[in-house]
UniProtKB/Swiss-Prot annotation:
Protein name: RING finger protein 225
Keyword Protease: no
Endpoints of the signal sequence: none
Lineage, highest ranks first: Eukaryota, Metazoa, Chordata, Craniata, Vertebrata
Primary localization class, coarse: membrane
Encoding gene (name): Rnf225
Keywords, ordered alphabetically: Membrane, Metal-binding, Transmembrane, Transmembrane helix, Zinc, Zinc-finger
Subcellular location: Membrane
Classification via Pfam families: zf-RING_UBOX
Zinc finger boundaries on the chain: RING-type: 63-111
Sequence segments annotated as region (Disordered): 1-55, 121-187, 259-332
Membrane topology: Single-pass membrane protein
GO molecular function: zinc ion binding
Length: 332
C-alpha cells in the first residue's frame, strides 16, 4: 500500500527550493529541483486509487484487518478486484456493516468496490491457497463448502452430499463440522430511533390502530346498542337452591284475624251453673231474651231489672233471679 507524504513536509521542501540558493542554482533558475519532481510523481500516483504498488503485510499468513492467521474454514484468504487479500470472516462482517443488499463490497484499504455473484456471495471470491499454512493446504476428506447467510448474519459450513459409493466406504466418519459463526444482523435490518424508516413504520402503525379503534366504536354504537334496546329480552333471574349446610328460617304461615263471635249456650234445667265462669253468667240473660218467642213476650209486662216474678224464683227457672236470690241470702 502506498504511503502518501504529509502536506507540511511538501511545503517545507518547496520553501527550501525557493529560498536563497548557491551560485550553481542561480545559473539555472528555471530548472525544477529533485524534491519537486518526487512530489509531482506522488500526486499523480495518488490520483487513482489502487494504482500504486501494494505493500505486502508484515506476515503474508495473516489478515490485514484482524491480524489472524488464515485457515481453511472461516479464515479463507479471499482476494478482491483491487488486489487486496482479507479473510472471509472480516469480509462478511464488513458486508453486514454496509448498507444495501450485499451485492458489492468495498475494500477497506482503497475503497474500490468489488461486485459479488448474485447467489453465491462472498464465498465465491477467488481464494489464495498460497497464503494458507501447510497443514491447511492439504484438502480434507469430505469437507463441505462454506456458506454465508447475510439475512441472518450467519457463516456456516454446509456438509457435503452423501457419496454414491459402497456402504463400506461410508463407515469412515468425517470429523464433525465446526459450529456456525454468528456475526450479527445486517445494517439494513437494524432499527434505530434516528432512522426515517423507524419513524415511518411508527406512523403507519399508529394510523392503523386509530382506524381499527374507530371501526370498532362505530359498530358498537350504531349496531350493538340499538339492537339491545329494541329487543324485549330481559335478563332472567334464576333462584338457586341453597347448599346443604346453609339453613334458612321457614316463612311464617298466615293466620286469619280473630273475630268476636257469640256462641249459643244450652238452656237445660239440669245444667250446673256453679261450675261456669262468672263472665259467662252475665251474658246468659241477653241470650235467653234473644231466644224467647216474641208471641210469648207480648203478654208479660215489662218489669225493672231488679224485680223478677215470684214463680220464677220458686221454680229456679230464671238463672238471673237465682243469682240475685243468692246475693240477698248472703247479705242477710
Amino acid at each position: 500500500m502506498p504511503c502518501p507524504r504529509l502536506p507540511w513536509l511538501r511545503r517545507h521542501r518547496t520553501s527550501q527550493g525557493s529560498g536563497p540558493s548557491s551560485p550553481s542554482t542561480v545559473s539555472a533558475p528555471n530548472s525544477p529541483s529533485r524534491g519537486e519532481d518526487e512530489d509531482a510523481e506522488e500526486e499523480e500516483g495518488d490520483g487513482t486509487p489502487g494504482s500504486g504498488p501494494i505493500l505486502p503485510p508484515t506476515s503474508p499468513m495473516e489478515c490485514l484487518i484482524c491480524v489472524s492467521p488464515f485457515d481453511g474454514i472461516f479464515k479463507l484468504p479471499k482476494r478482491l478486484d483491487c488486489g487486496h487479500v482479507f479473510c472471509l470472516e472480516c469480509l462478511a462482517r464488513l458486508s453486514l456493516a454496509t448498507a444495501g443488499g450485499g451485492d458489492a463490497v468495498a475494500c477497506p484499504m482503497c475503497r474500490a468496490p468489488t461486485r459479488l455473484a448474485p447467489r453465491r456471495g462472498l464465498p465465491a471470491l477467488p481464494t489464495q491457497p498460497g497464503l494458507l499454512p501447510r497443514d491447511a493446504r492439504a484438502p480434507l476428506p469430505r469437507q463441505g463448502s462454506v456458506r454465508f447467510d447475510r439475512r441472518r448474519g450467519l457463516l456456516y459450513l454446509r456438509p457435503p452430499p452423501p457419496s454414491p459409493g459402497p456402504r463400506k466406504s461410508r463407515t469412515v466418519r468425517a470429523p464433525p463440522p465446526p459450529p456456525p459463526l454468528r456475526l450479527g444482523r445486517p445494517l439494513s435490518r437494524r432499527l434505530s430511533l434516528s432512522s426515517p424508516a423507524w419513524a415511518f413504520n411508527a406512523a403507519v402503525a399508529l394510523a392503523v390502530l386509530v382506524a381499527a379503534g374507530l371501526v370498532v366504536s362505530g359498530v358498537y354504537i350504531f349496531f350493538l346498542i340499538p339492537h339491545v334496546t329494541n329487543s324485549g329480552v330481559r335478563p332472567q333471574t334464576v333462584a338457586l337452591a341453597p347448599e346443604n349446610d346453609f339453613w334458612v328460617s321457614p316463612r311464617p304461615t298466615p293466620v286469619a284475624p280473630w273475630t268476636h263471635a257469640w256462641t249459643r249456650r244450652p238452656t237445660k234445667p239440669d245444667l250446673d251453673l256453679d261450675d261456669t265462669l262468672p263472665e259467662a253468667t252475665k251474658d246468659t240473660p241477653e241470650l235467653e231474651e234473644a231466644t224467647k218467642d216474641p208471641v210469648e213476650t207480648q203478654g208479660i209486662p215489662d218489669l225493672p231489672p231488679d224485680q223478677t216474678p215470684k214463680a220464677e224464683i220458686d221454680l229456679n227457672w230464671n238463672p238471673k233471679a237465682q243469682a240475685d236470690g243468692k246475693k240477698v241470702q248472703l247479705q242477710q
